[in-house]
Amino acid sequence: MKGSLYSSKIAEPYAQALIGLAQQQNLTEVFGDNLRSLLTLLQDSPDLSAVLSSPVVKDEDKKSVLRSVLGDGGNGYLLNFLMLLVDKRRIVFLEAICEQYLALLRQFTNTVLAEVTSALKLTDAQKDQVKERVKQLTGAQAVELETKVDGDILGGIVIKVGSQVFDSSLRGQLRRVGLSLGTAL
């Protein structure tokens, strides 16, 4: 159900309710940090996702897992929200709810998500340069980066913000040269 229209339809009201609660309690960034960590954990640990979405695993066991995952650093409101998801049998949509919440948070804080692909791992200084460039291009107040390494681009970077793609990769430049040579003949 990951990424399906059905999943996002169910996740949306929960994410909106959660951001409403976060705004009331002035905890939008705290929830955002907790949900980013939880989302990373869900994506990196297929076992955790399997346990939470399994109909065979008892609800109390799921709650126990969530309590241990959030630990002492987790917010009480957020923990109660997760317990509600277990009770309502909506915990299977947790990943989609986290993604929707983070998208709403980006709208709320005028932050854009930039997906950056590079041939080599970017240094912190390079990430800061990319963030500044994306701010200039988009007019956003802040930039959230998702980075990945792809040796196939040969060099440079590709930045995707929403539906816009800024391709300054060597592969992209070679492709554009090839296209211009093809039309020049």
Swiss-Prot record:
GO BP: any one term: proton motive force-driven ATP synthesis
Coiled-coil annotated residue ranges, if any: none
GO MF entries: proton-transporting ATP synthase activity, rotational mechanism
Gene3D superfamilies named among the record's database cross-references: N-terminal domain of the delta subunit of the F1F0-ATP synthase (1.10.520.20)
Localization: Cellular thylakoid membrane
Pfam families: OSCP (PF00213)
GO cellular component, one term: proton-transporting ATP synthase complex
HAMAP family the UniProt entry points to: ATP_synth_delta_bact
Family: Belongs to the ATPase delta chain family.
Matches recorded under NCBIfam families: ATP_synt_delta (TIGR01145)
Subunit structure: F-type ATPases have 2 components, F(1) - the catalytic core - and F(0) - the membrane proton channel. F(1) has five subunits: alpha(3), beta(3), gamma(1), delta(1), epsilon(1). CF(0) has four main subunits: a(1), b(1), b'(1) and c(10-14). The alpha and beta chains form an alternating ring which encloses part of the gamma chain. F(1) is attached to F(0) by a central stalk formed by the gamma and epsilon chains, while a peripheral stalk is formed by the delta, b and b' chains.
Protein name per its UniProtKB record: ATP synthase subunit delta
The encoding gene: atpH
